[in-house]
Amino acid sequence: MSGLTIFSDQQPEKPLWQSHNAEEIQQQLTAIGVRFERWQADCELGENPQPEAVIAAYQHEIDRLVAENGYKSWDVISMRPDNPQREALREKFLSEHTHGEDEVRFFVEGSGLFCLHLNEKVYQILCEKNDLLSVPADIPHWFDMGSAPNFTAIRVFDNPEGWIARSTGDNIADGYPRLA
C-alpha cells in the first residue's frame, strides 16, 4: 500500500505526519508541487519483463504524459533481487541528488521509496504498483529500492539523454529509515 511519511529534516526518528490514504498523500504532495496519482497498471508482464513489452503495454499512458508536458524520451527500469548490480545501484540512488528536469516514474509493478528534501522536511513516499510520481526539477531527493529490489517502473524525461543526476553532497539520506 502506498504511503507518505513526513519528517523534520532535523529529526529522522520522529515522523510529523503519516498516511496510506491516496487522497491524503496527493493533497500533501500537491501542496509542495509534486504530482502523485493512482493509475491502472493492469497488464500482465511476466516474471522478467522486457522493456519493449512494458513500453508497448503502457504506450497510452506514456503518450498522455508526453502530450501534457512535452517529455522527449522514456525508458524502463526493472530490478529483481537477483540482479548482480543491485547493491551498487542502490548506493548510487541513495545519495541525495537533483535533476535539471522533472523526475517522472510510473510504477507498473513492485515498490520503491522516494525521499524528497525541501522546506526543512523530508517526505518519504512509498510508491507501489499503480503509482505515478512526478518530482519537479531541482528538488533534492534520493531513492531506496531496498536490499532485495523487486519493481518495474517507466521513467519519462525532458532530456533525450535520460537520467542525469547532480549530487548535492549532503549525507542526509544516511539518517532516515530505509526499505528492508
UniProtKB/Swiss-Prot annotation:
Cofactor binding notes: Binds 1 Fe(2+) cation per monomer.
GO biological process, one term: L-methionine salvage from S-adenosylmethionine
Molecular function, one GO term: acireductone dioxygenase (Ni2+-requiring) activity
UniProt EC number: 1.13.11.54, 1.13.11.53
Catalytic reaction annotation: 1,2-dihydroxy-5-(methylsulfanyl)pent-1-en-3-one + O2 = 3-(methylsulfanyl)propanoate + CO + formate + 2 H(+); 1,2-dihydroxy-5-(methylsulfanyl)pent-1-en-3-one + O2 = 4-methylsulfanyl-2-oxobutanoate + formate + 2 H(+)
Binding site for Fe(2+): 97, 99, 103, 141
Protein name: Acireductone dioxygenase
